[in-house]
Amino acid sequence: MKKKKTYGEVYALGQYISMSAPKARRVIDQIRGRSYEETLMLLALMPYRACDPILKLVNSAAANARHNMSFNEATLVISKAEVNEGTTVKKLKPRARGRSYPIRRPTCHIRIVLQDTSFDEFEEDFFSLKKDAWEKKIRTKI
């Protein structure tokens, strides 16, 4: 399946983060759709352990936007944020009398996508100009 090329979007991907997916989703649901600056404030104040790796990913995505695409951080918005389950690390905990109990350490993959809102305004202006020219051609033929 071919991926659709999107303009004005930058992402950061964190794989095999040692945390269960539902715990990470609890934080991700709070930041989805918010601006970059508002997200930084929210993540700094939330009391969850998942905030630290998510904050690193948001900063990494913003650095990608600044360096690779020359976007302004003030116009960035978190357009997509998703958490997928990763592999589960399985270990054995030794117990008394030669027994052992299994320990499962869940991991997750987090993807943060930032979108530049100034690009959307430019795109709307561009397509509105295109549409007007198209309508003029139709009117002249009639």
Swiss-Prot record:
Write out the annotated subcellular location. Plastid, Chloroplast
| Record GO terms (molecular function) | rRNA binding; structural constituent of ribosome
Identify one Pfam family in the record: Ribosomal_L22
GO CC entries: chloroplast; large ribosomal subunit
Keywords attached to this Swiss-Prot or TrEMBL record, sorted alphabetically, are:
Chloroplast, Plastid, Ribonucleoprotein, Ribosomal protein, RNA-binding, rRNA-binding
- Any one GO biological process: translation
Q: Which domain of life is it from?
A: Eukaryota
Is Ribonucleoprotein among this UniProt entry's keywords? yes
Q: Does the keyword Plastid apply?
A: yes
Q: How does it assemble?
A: Part of the 50S ribosomal subunit.
Instruction: List, alphabetically, the HAMAP family matched.
Output: Ribosomal_uL22_B
Q: Which family does it belong to?
A: Belongs to the universal ribosomal protein uL22 family.
NCBIfam families noted in UniProt = rplV_bact
Q: What does this protein do?
A: This protein binds specifically to 23S rRNA.
The entry's protein name is Large ribosomal subunit protein uL22c
Its organism's taxonomic lineage begins at:
Eukaryota, Viridiplantae, Streptophyta, Embryophyta, Tracheophyta
